[in-house]
Amino acid sequence: MPNWCENQATIQVPERFIAEALSCVLDDNRQVYEDYRKDIPEGRGLPFWGEQPLGLLGFFFPEPDYDGGDKELANDSVHHTFPDWYSWRVNNWGTKWEVDVEHYTREDNDDGSSTFFLYFDSAWSPPLGVYDAIHAKSNQGYSIYAIYIEGGMGFCGEYDNGSDNSYELGSRDTTDVPAHLQEEYSWHYDYMEENEEEEAVNG
């Protein structure tokens, strides 16, 4: 089993139809999503919901057709190895599994954009590749801000529209974690200090 990285992300999408589609994905409404996608000319770039469940990461950074890719490469005169799902996800998303969003809220803005506030865990590390994919479309009206913590491996960080800064958690006295992240993750430092006090008492 992996260590879990806790994530809070704020994602802005530029148009209401994208927000409606993303809400369907987050609510696991596959049929509504596919019906909605069919009503939009050429799907307007929305990913196809295949045999595997479509989630937050796949919505913004769709996975390849692993089976189809294998068949296509099998007919190639040059030997290739099509990536397995694990390798592709780790190399592209930055984490090995799709995420289950524990909670989200959505705000529809006056300019037609929508902002999502999401809370989810990811395996071992934050999905920085997906954040980069969202930021790559910033000229289309997308934006991404996220913070994360992986207490087991002792790091936390902040992603702000293309810039990722990661820090060793350390202790309150030694860490270089910015004050606003120390405050956000004060529960982690409280827990570590309580453990240190217990160890000191128990020898």
Task: Give each language-model segment a name.
Residues 1-203:
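Intrinsic low-complexity, intrinsically disordered or marginally ordered coil/linker segments
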